[in-house]
Amino acid sequence: MADRELFYLTHAGLTAWRWHDAAVHELARFTDGEAGIDAFSAHLAQHPQARCTLVADLADEAFHLETLPLLRGRDRRHLIARRQAQLHLDTPYVAHQSLGRDSGNPRSERLLIAALTRPPSLRPWLAAIAQAPTVLTGIHSTALLGMAVQRQLRPRPPRALLVHTTPAGLRISCFEHDLLRFSRLVPGLSPSTVGFWQSCRDEILRTSQYLIGQRALERGGATPVQVLAHPDQHAILRAACPDSPDLRFIPLDLPELARRCGLRSPPDSSDSLPLLLHLAV
């Protein structure tokens, strides 16, 4: 596969990465604001005809679980478009995925509608790309890329939380049969922060209580919490995150998982960004 450029977007700015021969390498960083946009435009001019992908890691997200009549083809597309319009998401950055038939009504389909709800966070960067001789192949969110991670895990319980860190912060996602139900980014949390894993546990507990209230998780169900982390953090993680009747914490070897996914430059820390970028190609 040809080289790719991957543009990783957070509220702090954008980082350009190159994917080559199943390895990712950071190229440059651009801060949020006019100076950063200008520098990014200059970078694009130096890489004409590059094929690129934008990966957004933003807290401004919305997830709506809908139950719709089971339709096919054009009728289904029109129904989904109409439902998205009724949600008044006020953003062009919307995706949907089927969660399968409703177990209580086989003539209905469960649908997750996901949206990036703050278009100004993306607009100036996308405008710079549009003005350059660059081919934008797609826009991904780290929340939806989590599904590709989840499918690589063994074993895969029917319901689980997936927890990982990126430069944007801590992300907690809920999966049901490998399909995303909910995702939340906690900005600013980093493994380099003092007391990080205790803060991580607090945020996971807060998220799980919300999901129990939404009936996405069962109270007292010992839901597996699969935490991607470097092995040198596993002992600290276990000490800070004891199991409870609601949650069962499972540290996962992030570098080993990255190698299993085919990444030839596995992370040397608990930062899952290199793996997510690889999965976006």
Region locations from a protein language model:
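Hydrophobic/aromatic-enriched cytosolic interaction surfaces used to assemble or bind macromolecules
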Residues: 1-281
